[in-house]
Structure formats: C-alpha cells, structure tokens
C-alpha cells in the first residue's frame, strides 16, 4: 500500500508493506544516488534490525555508519544531538550524504532534527518501527527534542524523502509499547475517520486483534495525517486538530519525567481530561467522554494520571507551542469524526485541569 504526501515543494511517498525492512536497499536506491548513509537508531531497535537494514543498504551499493543512543524519551535532548553531530563529523558526513531514522518516535524526532540542522540540512528518510511512529510521528516533517521546560520545545520542520513502514516490526514490541500507539489511533478516529472508529469499536482490544488489523489501522491513520499535513504543512490551521489530547498530554509527560508516562498514554489521558471539561462547558456532546474512556480502556490505555498536580501541569502548559500570548488553542471534538479549535484565555486552562 502506498500513500503520497503531495506537498508542493517536498512530495514523498509512504510505503506500507510487510517484510519491506529486508528490501530497504532497493527502496533507498530508487530515492538516493550511491552515498554514505548514517543510520540513527537506539540500542534496542539497533539490536533487532540494524543488521538487516545495514546489510540491505550495503548490498545496494551504499556505505553505512551507525549512531546508536540509549533507548527512551530521556535521550531525546540536545546532549544526544551534540553526540550525533560529533559522530557525523568524525565519520566525514557531507551535505551530499543522508540520514535514515530507524526506530520509534524518539529516534525519528531526534534523527530528523539532526538531519535538518547538520550542515544546514541533509537528506533524510524515516523507517518507523513502533506503532506510534508508524501512524503519527514519522509523517509530516515535525522534528524536535525535549528540554527541562517542555516536550519538543526545540525543533524544526524537515520533510523526509520517504517513509518505509513494515508492520511486521510491531511483533517485536512489548505489550505496553504497542498499546500506547493506540492512543494516536483512537485520536484519528475521533477527529476525522468515523470508519476507523467503528472498526476499532468492533475489535476486542487484544494485542492479537491489533496485530491482525495492523495494515488497516496504519493505512487509515496515515491517510488522516497525510490529508491534514498536505492542507496545513506548517501547523497554522487544521493541523492543530492532530493535537487533540496533546496539550495536557505533553504537560503530563514533562511533569512526570520524560519516559515515565509514554506518549500515547499521555495523549489518551489528555483526550479524556479535555473532553470531560469541554462536555461540562457544553462544547462537546453529552456522553462523548464516556465513549472515549470506554475505547481507551478496551485497548488498555490509561484514562487518569496520579499524582495530578494542577500547578505543575499549568506551569508546563505555559510553554506549550499552541500558546499565543495570553491565550491557548485547545482542540475539541464537537461530534465524532469532526474536530474544532476552541481558543481560551490561559487562566481558563485551570478549569480544564481541575474538572
């Protein structure tokens, strides 16, 4: 299956194909001339897939080097970026060479940031191996690293030259790592794709059901993301819809300590919290929050977080990228499959946290 992100200046394809990881070299050869490629990955994904990807690339005529960093959100920072820069310089990477991100969302975000800033930008490809990365973070060109103040506070827009998704990589994910990706999938059904929501409603929520329907889940999720990105590449309008649950979700990740609450888990909690407050204010229909809770809990996603420190969460929210002056843009779902922006004074955000 293939989708095209038809941006005017940087169009690229998303290829979804089981077993495609072993064909990485042939795929890259269609996109890039023979050159040096730096594979950026973490130590866990590297142990699983580095050899397969590296061998395929070298058989296709590419010279490869590998930069690995410790697995986890705690590594997504400027210290790791500087280590990557040093590695690239020492290995003679030039502007005519390229970077491949092999891994989950942390790897993709960090590798994309490195690619977009090293020598003012070099070629970049995404090979996402987690569900969260396959349905969300590998598409759309957002890169970024965390700071002590906020998640993804330092970042760029850097569209990849292509995205290769092998659903078979999901089989090696731990249960928690697979399930957290469903937070983003549930979001897509809520904000845009009623058919996807109804399909999810029919699944029993087990790991087996997710893996069995992975191709469908990935394709439909990518199609929502693709459509929104093409309409609003730089996040000034409808792309904000993709942030449903993320405003509070990012604050939870930051205040809990990066890596303690996984991204998709935080998104699920954020969607429930925003919906509960919006429903109380008449901005979302009665019963919507209950539907979201039921769907999240079926797949094993959390819907609450403890401790719930309102002051810490609010302080983190003041650094959110959707904050404009003394207001913040919240995404709500006035009806299933339809999102909207609700702009409120920043201080009113306290009410959304206290419900």
UniProtKB/Swiss-Prot annotation:
Q: What's a single GO CC term here?
A: cytoplasm
CDD domains in alphabetical order: DHQS (cd08195)
The transmembrane residues are none
Q: Give the residues the record marks as binding Zn(2+).
A: 184, 246, 263
Give me the comment on cofactor binding.
Answer: Binds 1 divalent metal cation per subunit. Can use either Co(2+) or Zn(2+).
Q: Kindly give the NCBIfam families that the UniProt entry links to this protein.
A: aroB
**Would you identify the family this protein belongs to, as annotated?**
Belongs to the sugar phosphate cyclases superfamily. Dehydroquinate synthase family.
Q: What does this protein do?
A: Catalyzes the conversion of 3-deoxy-D-arabino-heptulosonate 7-phosphate (DAHP) to dehydroquinate (DHQ).
Protein name per Swiss-Prot or TrEMBL: 3-dehydroquinate synthase
Gene, per the UniProt record: aroB
